[in-house]
């Protein structure tokens, strides 16, 4: 049986998403498989992550799938994209998005400036692999563990401030997904600080390298503040643009753009 699914494709600084309203999905769909099909850049629409949203009385629920069909707990760029989509559909400027019971407060200042308050973060040293497990990797790629920190921003991030070459970043990002290091995988952030700005590349679990990562920007900003490498406000720089970062009463707030790319119908064969 072939069915039609309405979709919107958007991106935040090149980090791209296929977004669908839950009301357009049949209960019989295998959502993990649907995510893999629609995310495929050759046989589907193509995206970094597949987003399902549902309207409730005073908030919007967002469900995130990676391209491998696994679920994700947070995505900052997708949140900005969804907030803009809701704004374009309804005119609402203040929007609450819920992801895995985490409340994200969004404000659409205009079509090119959407802010997201992701709340507070925690620095969970219990996530960090024991020194003997990670020492060989750190030594081989000259990673200073004193400048490496785990951040929980709703999803797990490891922020590395040591400078690595791009080819080494890929190797390290892959190796850190080993279950004996991080049981559920981890998002790996390679951060370099210049003039109070963080230049960032992120290996996202279940995806690989993406052109930008909003939650990674928030986690790296928080890590930079904690380690004294930057002060607020600051900016996180990606290949296709920047996110402006600030801290208010212990909450991390990012601001950036979100772009509408296309909308249409996807033909899904079960």
Swiss-Prot record:
<feature type="binding site">
    <location>
        <position position="49"/>
    </location>
    <ligand>
        <name>substrate</name>
    </ligand>
</feature>
<keyword id="KW-0457">Lysine biosynthesis</keyword>
<comment type="pathway">
    <text>Amino-acid biosynthesis; L-lysine biosynthesis via DAP pathway; DL-2,6-diaminopimelate from LL-2,6-diaminopimelate: step 1/1.</text>
</comment>
<comment type="similarity">
    <text>Belongs to the diaminopimelate epimerase family.</text>
</comment>
<dbReference type="InterPro" id="IPR001653">
    <property type="entry name" value="DAP_epimerase_DapF"/>
</dbReference>
<feature type="site" description="Could be important to modulate the pK values of the two catalytic cysteine residues">
    <location>
        <position position="204"/>
    </location>
</feature>
<comment type="function">
    <text>Catalyzes the stereoinversion of LL-2,6-diaminopimelate (L,L-DAP) to meso-diaminopimelate (meso-DAP), a precursor of L-lysine and an essential component of the bacterial peptidoglycan.</text>
</comment>
<feature type="binding site">
    <location>
        <begin position="214"/>
        <end position="215"/>
    </location>
    <ligand>
        <name>substrate</name>
    </ligand>
</feature>
<feature type="site" description="Could be important to modulate the pK values of the two catalytic cysteine residues">
    <location>
        <position position="157"/>
    </location>
</feature>
<feature type="binding site">
    <location>
        <position position="155"/>
    </location>
    <ligand>
        <name>substrate</name>
    </ligand>
</feature>
<keyword id="KW-0028">Amino-acid biosynthesis</keyword>
<feature type="active site" description="Proton donor">
    <location>
        <position position="75"/>
    </location>
</feature>
<feature type="binding site">
    <location>
        <begin position="204"/>
        <end position="205"/>
    </location>
    <ligand>
        <name>substrate</name>
    </ligand>
</feature>
<dbReference type="GO" id="GO:0009089">
    <property type="term" value="P:lysine biosynthetic process via diaminopimelate"/>
</dbReference>
<dbReference type="Pfam" id="PF01678">
    <property type="entry name" value="DAP_epimerase"/>
</dbReference>
<feature type="binding site">
    <location>
        <begin position="76"/>
        <end position="77"/>
    </location>
    <ligand>
        <name>substrate</name>
    </ligand>
</feature>
<comment type="subunit">
    <text>Homodimer.</text>
</comment>
<feature type="binding site">
    <location>
        <position position="15"/>
    </location>
    <ligand>
        <name>substrate</name>
    </ligand>
</feature>
<keyword id="KW-0413">Isomerase</keyword>
<protein>
    <recommendedName>
        <fullName>Diaminopimelate epimerase</fullName>
        <ecNumber>5.1.1.7</ecNumber>
    </recommendedName>
</protein>
<dbReference type="InterPro" id="IPR018510">
    <property type="entry name" value="DAP_epimerase_AS"/>
</dbReference>
<dbReference type="GO" id="GO:0005829">
    <property type="term" value="C:cytosol"/>
</dbReference>
<feature type="active site" description="Proton acceptor">
    <location>
        <position position="213"/>
    </location>
</feature>
<feature type="binding site">
    <location>
        <position position="66"/>
    </location>
    <ligand>
        <name>substrate</name>
    </ligand>
</feature>
<feature type="binding site">
    <location>
        <position position="187"/>
    </location>
    <ligand>
        <name>substrate</name>
    </ligand>
</feature>
<dbReference type="GO" id="GO:0008837">
    <property type="term" value="F:diaminopimelate epimerase activity"/>
</dbReference>
<keyword id="KW-0963">Cytoplasm</keyword>
């Amino acid at each position: 049986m072939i069915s039609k699914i309405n979709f919107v494709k958007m991106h935040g600084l090149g980090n791209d998403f296929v977004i669908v309203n839950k009301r357009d999905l049949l209960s019989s769909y295998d959502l993990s498989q649907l995510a893999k099909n629609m995310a495929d850049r050759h046989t589907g629409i193509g995206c970094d992550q597949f987003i399902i949203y549902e309207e409730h009385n005073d908030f919007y629920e967002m469900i995130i799938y990676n391209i491998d069909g696994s679920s994700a707990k947070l995505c900052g760029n997708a949140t900005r994209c969804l907030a803009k989509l809701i704004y374009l559909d309804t005119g609402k400027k203040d929007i609450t998005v819920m992801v895995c019971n985490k409340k994200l407060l969004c404000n659409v200042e205009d079509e090119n400036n959407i802010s997201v308050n992701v709340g507070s973060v925690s620095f969970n040293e219990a996530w960090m692999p024991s020194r003997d497990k990670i020492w060989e990797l750190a030594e081989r790629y000259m990673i200073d563990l004193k400048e490496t920190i785990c951040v929980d921003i709703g999803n797990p991030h490891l922020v590395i401030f040591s400078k690595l070459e791009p080819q080494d970043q890929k190797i390290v990002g892959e190796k850190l997904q080993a279950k004996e290091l991080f049981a559920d995988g981890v998002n790996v952030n390679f951060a370099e600080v210049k003039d109070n700005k963080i230049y960032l590349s992120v290996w996202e679990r279940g995806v690989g390298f993406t052109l930008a990562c909003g939650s990674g920007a928030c986690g790296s900003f928080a890590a930079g503040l904690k380690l004294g490498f930057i002060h607020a406000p600051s900016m996180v720089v990606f290949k296709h643009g920047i996110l402006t970062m600030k801290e208010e009463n212990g909450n991390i707030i990012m601001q950036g753009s979100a772009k509408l790319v296309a909308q249409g119908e996807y033909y899904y064969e079960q």
